[in-house]
Each structure stands twice: as C-alpha cells, then as structure tokens.
A protein has these predicted regions:
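Bacterial N-terminal signal peptides that target proteins for export
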Residues: 1-9
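Acidic/histidine-rich, surface-exposed loop or edge segments in extracytoplasmic proteins
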Residues: 41-47, 52-71, 97-109
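Hydrophobic/aromatic-rich core segments of domains that either
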Residues: 128-191
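Bacterial signal peptide processing site
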Residues: 21-24
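Mid-length scaffold segments of soluble, non-membrane domains
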Residues: 79-139
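Low-complexity, Gly/Ser/Thr/Pro-rich intrinsically disordered linker/tail segments
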Residues: 192-203
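Bacterial N-terminal signal peptides
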Residues: 9-18
Length: 203
C-alpha cells in the first residue's frame, strides 16, 4: 500500500498542475477599481500588479453590454459573462501576454499568466467597477469563495461571486477559459462540490 506521504505528494502535484498554485484567499488583496483604474493581478497569487486604465470608451462599452441584461437576472448573468470577456481582452494591453486557460505547471512567476487567485481577484475588481457605476440591476458583488484543500481530494480553487435578489450566490469563474473567453457562471452551491482530482480536476 502506498505510504501516506507518497499519496499526499501525488495529490499535491496533481493539484498544482490543474488547480491553483496557492491557497491564498483572493479576497485578502482588496483590489478594487479606483476611479478609472484597476490593478490587474498576474504572475500567480497576485505576484505582479499592472494598472489598467478604463477610459470613456470602455465605460460606454460596459454600459452597452450590461444594458442587454436588464430584463432579468438570467440575462444579466449572460451580460456579465460578456463584460468579463471584454475586460480580459483589455487586460492584455497591460500584461502584454495572452493568459492560457487554467493554471500551467511551472508558470508561477511568469508575467501575464494567471492562476485562480489572479483570475478571481481581477474578476471581482471588474464586478465592483460595474457595481459602482450602477450597471448591475439584478445582482450585487459578494466576497470571493474558495473550495478544496488537497486532503479532501480536490485542488485549491477560488472564484468571484455575485448574489441575486433572492439571495442566491453565483460563481463567476474565469479560470477555465483562455483570456477573453466566457467565464463559467453557475450557482455557488453547484460550484463548491466540484474539482475532484479523480474526475480530472477540470470539471
């Protein structure tokens, strides 16, 4: 029978390859949009921060995107997904690199590459930017959420979170898609149990 240490090592290696490099709470960074600027985290666990200035054209673009979601919470979540995609395409202007999907083993410390701490922190900063401009009608921004701690068979993973008028929380997880791709938006209650290494760690 494999030793406990060997099993733990395999779990840790699998988690590092498929999930977050760090178990740091992404909410601790406190990054928000200050005026028209957002500090974009990258390099894994927010090692680097690059300032992105969102101008008047960006504000109009976000307003147009979110206007399409005013009819219902479901429509707004779809609009939020499009807003995240646009925001990520803008972040490339300051990182200079197109972030690959998920976390690549060995990419820690590489400028422009993002783990789930970077992704969830950046997404929350955007959501707060939208909220401050009253572009969100059906949702408010909640604290980021985390799941997994290796010993339960899951890799560490973080996500941004929104809450609808009924109090239901929704994960806004941009980690799985490449930069500019649509984030996964699903009930947080469904997001929390996912991420078992036995299933490939990519569900």
């Amino acid at each position: 029978m494999p030793s406990f240490q060997r099993v733990l090592s395999l779990i840790l290696l699998g988690g590092l390859a498929a999930g977050c490099v760090s178990g740091v709470d992404s909410g601790r960074y406190g990054i928000e949009a200050v005026g028209r600027q957002i500090d974009v985290c990258h390099g894994y666990s927010c090692k680097y921060r690059s300032k992105l200035t969102l101008g008047a054209a960006d504000t109009r673009r976000f307003a147009s995107i979110l206007a399409a979601g005013q009819k219902s919470p479901q429509a707004e979540r779809a609009a939020i997904a499009r807003a995240v995609s646009y925001f990520e395409s803008r972040t490339r202007a300051v990182t200079g690199v197109r972030d690959e999907p998920q976390s690549k083993f060995g990419a820690s410390g590489v400028r422009g590459q993002m783990d789930c701490v970077d992704e969830s922190t950046n997404t929350r900063a955007l959501l707060l930017y939208l909220e401050k401009r009253r572009l969100l009608r059906h949702h408010t921004v909640a604290r980021n959420a985390s799941r997994g701690f290796f010993l339960d068979g899951r890799y560490l993973h973080n996500t941004a979170v929104i809450r609808d008028a009924r109090g239901v929380k929704w994960a806004v997880d941009s980690w799985y898609a490449p930069m500019g791709g649509a984030p996964d938006i699903l009930p947080l209650s469904q997001w929390m149990p996912r991420g078992f290494l036995s299933s490939g760690a990519l569900n």
